[in-house]
Amino acid sequence: MASNQHIGASNLNENEAILTNRVAELERRMSMFEGIFHALSNRLDLHFKKYDVVVNSQQQQINELTAFLSTLLNDQQRHAEILSEKLSGTLHGVSATSISLSQTLDPQGFTDGTTAPGAPRNYTSVPMNNDQTAHPQNEGAVSNETLFEDILNGNSQENDKSQQQTNSSNSISQENNSTNPSVDTRFNKPQNYNSNLVPSLEEYSANPPNNDGGQSQGLYISSNSSQSRQSPNLQKVSPNHENAVESNAQESVPTFEEEQYETKTGLKRKRIVCTRPFEFIKSPHSVMEVWKEYTEGVNGQPSIRKMEALYQTAWRRDPAVNKRYSRRKVLWKAIQTGLNRGYSLNYVVEILENSRYVNDKQKVKQPIGWLCHSSHIPETLK
């Protein structure tokens, strides 16, 4: 019995040892798996963070690219609109020029006398005028045929009537030939032609002749009295038009001009175009010079305030001009602030001039460029 109990106790001890070893092995494996799981989770977290950074950077780049493309498309659309406006303005100018030239070269513009205000004017071409001159000749031909038939029939009275009709048709054709000359005599330049008094195409597009319905203007002026007596129809130039042509010939090329086009309601302004770059005062010596440049203009140029009102930013597209404008804008704004607060112009200029002094005893001043920085503007003018 004692031996059996001893054997049973030893077996229990062995089983407990085996269970303990298995439990320890399982705990070790569980801890190992837990460590592997934590390592994998940490690694996944790192990968997720990297992916988030990459996705955010890509999204930012996509947003920047989208903004750039939208800006580029807007600029292209605006440029296309500007080009279309310029093209339409050019077409309007060409059409207005052709209309004014057709009115200028109208044969009725070289005839004497005035027509009624409500009377329509003839703007037909040369072939139609030739048809009109040839029409009385056709009537004369018909009258000759009737005359031949009347002679065959022996009707003397109808013969006299047909002869009267023939004479009247010939007189009408001669009058038409005198009033409406041929193409060669009508459009050839006379000997007293003066090229300085003929306005150019640009002048007719900008200032087309007024259609007053009764008084037409000629293009040529006779300088010889005998020739003027022989061709009185060529002296239909009004004194206002002559003075305008001579003044346009004497004036130089304008700096600032307006593009105009003609519509059904009259001549309208298209837009104002700046034809030369703006020149700032180089190294101004006082604040008053800078202010006068902004408000009054110098060297025959308009004021910068007027340039901004007319052209916005179109007049300072040059980088150098835009940079100088941005620097001096600080000084103009300071003066305007002082004026808005009720200070006089002389007082504001005196404050700015006093702030330029480096040494009051030697009267040494900083340049105007130093004063164009916002940090150097006095506090009372900020």
Curated annotation (Swiss-Prot):
GO-annotated cellular components: cytoplasm; nucleus
Presence of the UniProt keyword Transcription in the record: yes
Entry-linked InterPro entries: HOT1, TF_GCR1-like
Keywords associated with the record: Activator, DNA-binding, Nucleus, Transcription, Transcription regulation
Keyword DNA-binding annotated: yes
Stretches with biased composition (Polar residues): 104-114, 122-138, 181-198, 207-221, 232-253
Region (Disordered): 104-138, 155-260
Region feature Leucine-zipper, mapped onto this chain: 12-26
GO terms assigned for molecular function: DNA-binding transcription factor activity, RNA polymerase II-specific; RNA polymerase II cis-regulatory region sequence-specific DNA binding; sequence-specific DNA binding
Nuclear localization signal (motif): residue ranges: 266-271
Subcellular location field: Nucleus
Biological processes, Gene Ontology terms: cellular hyperosmotic salinity response; cellular response to heat; cellular response to methylglyoxal; positive regulation of invasive growth in response to glucose limitation; positive regulation of pseudohyphal growth; positive regulation of ribosomal protein gene transcription by RNA polymerase II; positive regulation of starch catabolic process; positive regulation of transcription by RNA polymerase II
Compositional bias annotation for Low complexity: 162-180, 222-231
General function of this protein: May function as a transcriptional activator. Increased dosage of MSN1 restores invertase expression in yeast mutants defective in the SNF1 protein kinase, and msn1 disruption reduced derepression of invertase in the wild-type. May affect SUC2 expression. Expression of MSN1 enhances growth in iron-limiting conditions.
Note: Present with 491 molecules/cell in log phase SD medium.
PANTHER family the record matches: PROTEIN MSN1
Name assigned to this protein: Protein MSN1
Source organism: Saccharomyces cerevisiae (strain ATCC 204508 / S288c) (Baker's yeast)
